Structures are given as structure tokens and as C-alpha cells.
Design a protein with these regions (language model features):
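Conserved active-site neighborhood of the chymotrypsin/trypsin-like protease fold
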Residues: 1-54, 87, 111
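Terminal peptide-recognition signature
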Residues: 2, 16, 39, 44, ...
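Active-site region of chymotrypsin-like
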Residues: 19-29, 54-112, 120, 125, ...
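PDZ/PDZ-like domain segments forming the peptide/carboxylate-binding groove
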Residues: 83-84, 88, 92-93, 146-195
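C-terminal, low-ordered peptide segments at domain boundaries
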Residues: 24-31, 38, 198-199, 213, ...
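Beta-strand/loop subdomains of soluble extracytoplasmic proteins
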Residues: 1-3, 37-43, 54-67, 121-124, ...
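PDZ domains, with a preference for the canonical peptide-binding region formed by the helix
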Residues: 178, 189-227
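PDZ/PDZ-like peptide-tail recognition elements
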Residues: 32, 62, 124-166
Length: 233
């Protein structure tokens, strides 16, 4: 017998409690690792197609990026692999070098050897979130923004000598930045991450992803620093 303790539709994750005494006897917990590198080998464990024997498929990490999950319009960090992920594999661990680097997420219909997994930072965020007995979800800036690719537009805003900065077009109601930023500001940095004009940050050397990577590394109540350009200052 098992019961669902917590569920996150935005992450497509759930925490399940097994009530049977001794269910985990003889097992050893798997340790989490960080985000795998491109070309790292991975193995995905699961029970596809309703089988009763453990299936292991192997492949490599193709890319790490931000993309939409199944049940949300928000983009979160996601890993892509050429290891087969079939129905029934979802929720299985993705293992690299003996440690968990993610949770099998889905395959792309109509495409062979393309599967996706939820990287451990998202899984850990979910687990840390529910430690207090409540699920709060992922923090959001609550802004509408646009890229600043045009040299003339950048000059008008005072950021012509750098490639960083995105234009704030609107602050949504109840945004944590509602009384701090305003329309027309140029958002330059979050914490120590410079935001490129296309809205990306370098999350590790020579690899970029959506600037929300920085926001989504936080839990509610944690400090997030920002740097802006306003009126060319």
C-alpha cells in the first residue's frame, strides 16, 4: 500500500510514501549528483510497457536547457538524452557515474532516441520545498520582458557598450518586484549572473540557458540580488 504525500504538477513530480513495513529492507539509498555534462553517459532504469522486469537503457546527455514541462507553460531546466524513454520509464532514476543526475520525464512522440529527464536541481528544489509540510512551488519574477538586440535601441537605453540586459515591458500584479522595478528598466544581472540581451545566463562555462535558472535556484524567502539600468544610470 502506498499514498501520495505531495504532488507538483509544474515539476511533474510527486512524493509517494510506502506504508508496508520492511519495504526498503536490503536497499541502499542512491546519492544525488549535479547537472551532468554534455556527452556524459547515462543509464535509465524503469519498467516500460507495464513489464515486471527492470529495464535499463543507455545513452549520452545531448543538451541541458530550459523547456516547458508537460503540465505547465513555465520553462524549467531539462536534460535531453538519446537513451530510450518509453511509457513506464517515467519516474525512473537517471544514473551517471553511480549517482542520480535526474528523473526520467518523457519521450518525444514521433522521434526516435530522444528522451528527457528532470535534472537533480529541480528534484532537490521540490524536496526542500516540502520539508515544512507545505508545497509552495517555484518562485517567479512576474515580469514581461523583451530582448535587446537592436544597437539603436540599446544606445537609447544606455547599454550600447555591453551585450547584457533585457528590457522590462511590464511588472505583473503581485510580482515580488512590483515596487522595485518599473517599465523601461533594463535588467542587467541576477546575483552574480550577467543576463545577455537574449535573456540567457552562463550557468556553467560556455553553456547558457534561460535567466530564470537563477530565480529557480531560490526558495521562497531567500534573497535574490539584481542590477538594473534606469534612465541610463
Amino acid at each position: 500500500k502506498a499514498s501520495v504525500e505531495f504532488i507538483s504538477e509544474e515539476y511533474d513530480l510527486a512524493l509517494i510514501k510506502v506504508d508496508e513495513p520492511g519495504f526498503f529492507n536490503g536497499t541502499v539509498p542512491l546519492k544525488f549528483s549535479g547537472i551532468p555534462m554534455n556527452r556524459d553517459k547515462v543509464a535509465i532504469y524503469g519498467y516500460p510497457m507495464g513489464g515486471d522486469k527492470l529495464s535499463i537503457t543507455e545513452g549520452i546527455v545531448s543538451r541541458i536547457e530550459h523547456s516547458k514541462y508537460t503540465l505547465t507553460t513555465e520553462k524549467f531546466l531539462i536534460g535531453q538524452t538519446d537513451a530510450a524513454i518509453n511509457p513506464g520509464n517515467s519516474g525512473g532514476p537517471v544514473i551517471s557515474k553511480g549517482k542520480v543526475v535526474g528523473v526520467a520525464f518523457s519521450g518525444l512522440l514521433g522521434a526516435d532516441n530522444i528522451g528527457y529527464f528532470i535534472p537533480t536541481p529541480i528534484v532537490e528544489h521540490f524536496l526542500n520545498d516540502i520539508k515544512d509540510g507545505n508545497y509552495d512551488g517555484m518562485p517567479k519574477l512576474g515580469i514581461i520582458w523583451s530582448e535587446l538586440e537592436s544597437p539603436s535601441h540599446r544606445k537609447m537605453l544606455g547599454v550600447e557598450n555591453t551585450s547584457t540586459g533585457i528590457l522590462i515591458k511590464k511588472i505583473k500584479k503581485n510580482s515580488p518586484l512590483e515596487n522595485m522595478l518599473k517599465k523601461g528598466d533594463v535588467l542587467l544581472k541576477l546575483d552574480n549572473y550577467s543576463i545577455e540581451y537574449d535573456g540567457t545566463v552562463e550557468f556553467r562555462k560556455n553553456e547558457r540557458t534561460d535567466f530564470n535558472y537563477v530565480v529557480q535556484s531560490k526558495n521562497f524567502g531567500e534573497l535574490l540580488r539584481y542590477e538594473i539600468m534606469r534612465d541610463k544610470k
